[in-house]
């Protein structure tokens, strides 16, 4: 089961994300946060597999919240959401620890495949190092 924390300051976007994700039986939305500060706290409390976070949030930006989440729980996969920002902001979000940044306009077709791909990508280094270790 992929446990997901949704972070967006607009309830309508939260509901849209829920509606998209509830179509997939391997996804469980475990919580919702409305700002960056709540995102960091909920991530520590709920320990989601994936955090889907808007880049532009009140209190703490999505970028800063991503950095803090990854600092506290490096195994968490973070996906950024944007309504359209400059490339340098997307790059900065990736540098903060986001596995990917999605356009809100592409959520219906891209959200689930991006979650799966980001999880596969994040598992590769751990799997490779674990398989290279000798068994005792």
Task: Show where each model-derived region lies.
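Conserved phosphotransfer cores of two-component systems
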Residues: 44-46, 68-76, 96
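The feature encodes the CheY-like receiver
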Residues: 13, 58
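Acidic catalytic/metal-coordinating carboxylates
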Residues: 35-38, 61-64
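Short hydrophobic/Thr-rich beta-strand motif most characteristic of the beta2 strand and flanking loop
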Residues: 26-34, 42
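CheY-like receiver
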Residues: 113, 120-136
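Alpha4 helix (beta4-alpha4-beta5 surface) of REC/receiver domains from two-component response regulators
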Residues: 64, 85-113, 117-118
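Active-site beta3 strand of CheY-like receiver
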Residues: 46-52, 57
